[in-house]
Amino acid sequence: MAKRLLPLTAEVSKACIRLLNLPLIEISILTLAKQGVRNFIFGVKGYVNYRSLHDHFESGVGFSAKYGINPRIHIKYQPNLDDCGSADSVRVNVEYYDVTDPVFAVQGDNIFDINLEDMLKFHEQKKAFLTIGLMRVSDVTGYGIAKVDSDTHISEFVEKPTLKEAPSNLANTGLYLFSPEVREVFKEDKVQEMIRKNKRLDFG
């Protein structure tokens, strides 16, 4: 439960909190649907979260009609399987739904403005396994700040650093683009050991 947003999240998923009378996640879905994304998987668990999202979106038919999205979007939901965090939720869903396309992962309460086609082109040009969206910020102390080399490779994130500690002013936006090979990476022994040891597999 998103305790920092109580009482707003007492009976509704954080992703369904309203901004300009729209659930936050509806704004995100519309941003992506306008760019041609048609298949969505909600990595949701817990009764309140599932009920909030399913009652509002169901399979996406009503959303598509509301915004004139044609062909319509298709929304699926995480199966009733335990996960160990946001990254592990991606693992669960790509396996369960046999996803073989690139995967764009974003938190449900994240509002963003991104050209997904440009991000995908960059991702493919770099032959990357994972591309993370970064944003320049004036105040680095409230974000995970990336250390990036001249070829745009990220070597580490420094979480909420002081100005002196910050390796750059590039903040993690919480937007992640995975190649289809993500399924094989999740099966690697070191990833499985990380899950067993830490009981968590989060994006951060």
Where are the language model's segments positioned?
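N-terminal glycine-rich phosphate-binding loop and ensuing alpha1 helix
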Residues: 1-59
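Residue-level signal for inorganic ion chemistry
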Residues: 25, 93, 109, 123, ...
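Short alpha-helix within the catalytic core of nucleotide-sugar-dependent glycosyltransferases
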Residues: 29-30, 51, 58, 91, ...
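Short aromatic-hydrophobic micro-motifs that form the base-stacking/packing surface
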Residues: 41, 102-106
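Short phosphate-binding loop-to-helix
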Residues: 51-103, 166-167
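Catalytic-core segments of class I nucleotidyltransferases/pyrophosphorylases
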Residues: 104, 111, 117-124, 138-140, ...
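A short, conserved acidic/glycine-rich loop-to-beta-strand motif
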Residues: 126-136
